[in-house]
Structures are given as C-alpha cells and as structure tokens.
Amino acid sequence: MTATRHFLLAAGGTGGHMLPAYALADELIARGHRVALVSDDRGLKIPGAPAELETHVLPAGRASGGPLGWLKGALAIRKGRRMAIELIDDFDPAVVVGFGGYPSLPSLLAAGATKRPRVIHEQNAVLGRVNRLMAPRVDAVAVAYHHIQRYPAGHELKMHITGNPVRDEIVAIREEGFPPLLEDGIFRLLVVGGSLGATVLSEVVPAAIAMLPRALLDRLQVVQQCREDDLEAVRARYAELGVAAECAPYIKDFPERLRWAHMVIARAGASTVAELACAGRPAIFVPYPHAMDDHQTYNVVDLVEAGGAISFRQSDFIPAEVAKHIQRMAVEPGVLEEAAERAASCGLPDATRDLADLVESFAAPPMMDVIRVGASLPRAASGIAAARREAK
C-alpha cells in the first residue's frame, strides 16, 4: 500500500491552470495522499475541485502596470511568500507543484526557501511568465508538447513530456472509438469558443454553413457555444437555413457533446487541444490572436502537422474556406476517419497518471517505509539518514 504523503499544489486563477491542478489532485488523493491547493479567490470559484481537496488563498500581486504596479505586485508576492512558508511549515508537503499563473509564485518561492522539491507543469506550448522564471530553479518541468517555446537554455534535462491532464470522461471517448459516418448520414458539428464563446465563430461559422449545398444542410446537426450577445442572431440564422442547431452560452455536458461530434471548430486553449486529441476528433482551430506570446497558435502545431486538424489565423478565417473544409469532411467519410486517427495519435490519455508518477518520484519516503524495506537494522538506519538528508 502506498504511504500517505502531503502534496501542495499552486495554480493561477484561470481554468487553464486550475483544471490540470484538479486532475492531479484527484489522482494523488486516489493514491491515498493528502493534497492542498493554493490559488486566488477567482481560481477557487472554478468548479471541479475534488471534495477532499484542502484549499487556501494567498496574496499574489501581478507585477505590471508601471512602477507603482510593480511595487504593489512585489509587496503582495513577498507577503504571499511569507504566508506560504507558514503553510508549508504546517502542512509539511513532500513536494510543491506549480501550474503557472501569478498565484503559483509565492508557494514556489516558499518551497525553495524551505528546501522542498519543486515541480512545475506548463499547459501551453509556450512557457508562461511564472514558469519561465521558475524553470531554472525547480527540480522538474512537466510539459504537454515536444516543442516548447521560450524554454530556458541549459535546463532541457529537467523537461518531462507528460501531456495535459484530461478528464476520465474524455479518455472514455477515446476508448469507444470514432462514431461511424455514412455517406448520406447525419454529420454532427460542435463549435466551441473558450469559456464564454467567441464572436468570430458566431459570425463566420453560420455564414460558412450557408454556403453548403442543400443536400448537406439536410444532413447537418450543429451544437454551438455563443456569447450571450450573439445567441439570438445565431439561432435565427440557423433556423432560416433550416439547419438543426442547438445554441447556448455555455456547454455544460461538454464530454457528451464531444462524444456526439464528428468534427469540432474551436479556439486553441491548452485544455481544448488536449481533449480533442485525446478523444480523436478532427478540428478546425482558430487560435485567439491576443493570447500571451501567441501560445494558442503554437498549441496546435503538433495536431496540424499530424493531419488531425487545420488552423486558421483569425484574419484568414473566412466562410468560403471553412465551408470547403466542412464539405470535404462531411461527404468523404474515409477522409474524416483518417483525420480522426491522426488526431488521436497526438493524444496523451495517461497524462494525469504520468504527471502524478513524476511528482511522487520527488517525494522522500516516509520513515516507516524506510524501516520496512531495510533488511537489517544498519541498513534501515542508513536509509533513514539518507531520507532525512533528501527531505532537507
């Protein structure tokens, strides 16, 4: 039986940071460990946290906005670091794991001050600011892609490709396989645009569908996430076209909708890309053009090169090109199925387990474990001394 250890996770206040942290927490708790998570107020409002997860809010100012903003941010980070040291002294984690974002920084700095092993996980194909700062200082860097931009030179040996943790419901879709499509059968299209939808998708996708032949419109079913402001106009356009469509500002049952879909049109956030690849769903990606360091464009490189997706810069995302791609996939089942296989080849369904294995590997064994594995008293005493040295 695995001995219980304590792990402290720290993540920024967005779903992109929090959901992988929740997934790792779930896995570590299932392995019998005790897990705590540090974030900000915004992060801890994101649903999906395991019931057994302990949560803490620490100050973590953002160092930006001119000299005064930098000073306020630095003072908040310093205060957060001091409070994180107190938390670490009390919780006694074997390892501290950061998931990026400014709220992860105080805990990682405190872990360094208290000589705790540190692991960071980067969800995107471009290392974020906090992870870029911490990569030279931590023990391991878990990444989701083979090619990582802005990774500090000289620290490549710390890099471990684990992938982005995905939900068990998504892994189950992969195991079920791709839904068959007959040449004259229903073609199911899922359109998602980040947490609250994207206006560009609400404008371009219905216009593209309007260009399809009548025979294909009769076979088409659409589920589309829309911004509240766009909702009625998109519904009206599909009704005018006679297309069976369901539109909503938020897709609550996303795994079930993904299982249903033959193809997806989406933004290119790290979680979305990971889930589509794991499920094996062909996609048209429209990376958000204002993402930090253009990381969404880099997130889809592997999938596009494998043939499981195509990607448009937002300025090139025009109805005629989108219609052409939808039509080809809908009328050529062989092409669609091959794209699905190529997408699945980029999926990493064991990402959560692999990340948990990596994190556990840096946890010093508890004293009783060392005693149990010792063949003799001298060996046990030697093991205890080594474990204490590692834990310092």
From Swiss-Prot:
Pathway: Cell wall biogenesis; peptidoglycan biosynthesis. InterPro entries: GlcNAc_MurG, Glyco_trans_28_C, GlycoTrans_28_N. SUPFAM superfamilies: UDP-Glycosyltransferase/glycogen phosphorylase (SSF53756). Belongs to the glycosyltransferase 28 family. MurG subfamily. Keywords: Cell cycle, Cell division, Cell inner membrane, Cell membrane, Cell shape, Cell wall biogenesis/degradation, Glycosyltransferase, Membrane, Peptidoglycan synthesis, Transferase. Cell wall formation. Catalyzes the transfer of a GlcNAc subunit on undecaprenyl-pyrophosphoryl-MurNAc-pentapeptide (lipid intermediate I) to form undecaprenyl-pyrophosphoryl-MurNAc-(pentapeptide)GlcNAc (lipid intermediate II). It comes from Sphingopyxis alaskensis (strain DSM 13593 / LMG 18877 / RB2256) (Sphingomonas alaskensis). The keyword Glycosyltransferase applies. It comes from the Bacteria. It catalyses: di-trans,octa-cis-undecaprenyl diphospho-N-acetyl-alpha-D-muramoyl-L-alanyl-D-glutamyl-meso-2,6-diaminopimeloyl-D-alanyl-D-alanine + UDP-N-acetyl-alpha-D-glucosamine = di-trans,octa-cis-undecaprenyl diphospho-[N-acetyl-alpha-D-glucosaminyl-(1->4)]-N-acetyl-alpha-D-muramoyl-L-alanyl-D-glutamyl-meso-2,6-diaminopimeloyl-D-alanyl-D-alanine + UDP + H(+). UDP-N-acetyl-alpha-D-glucosamine binds at T14, G15, G16, N124, R167, S195, I251, Q296. GO terms for molecular function: UDP-N-acetyl-D-glucosamine:N-acetylmuramoyl-L-alanyl-D-glutamyl-meso-2,6-diaminopimelyl-D-alanyl-D-alanine-diphosphoundecaprenol 4-beta-N-acetylglucosaminlytransferase activity; undecaprenyldiphospho-muramoylpentapeptide beta-N-acetylglucosaminyltransferase activity. Its EC number is 2.4.1.227. Its main location: membrane. This is UDP-N-acetylglucosamine--N-acetylmuramyl-(pentapeptide) pyrophosphoryl-undecaprenol N-acetylglucosamine transferase. PANTHER family: GLYCOSYLTRANSFERASE, UDP-N-ACETYLGLUCOSAMINE--N-ACETYLMURAMYL-(PENTAPEPTIDE) PYROPHOSPHORYL-UNDECAPRENOL N-ACETYLGLUCOSAMINE TRANSFERASE 1. One of its GO terms (biological process) is carbohydrate metabolic process. NCBIfam families: murG (TIGR01133).
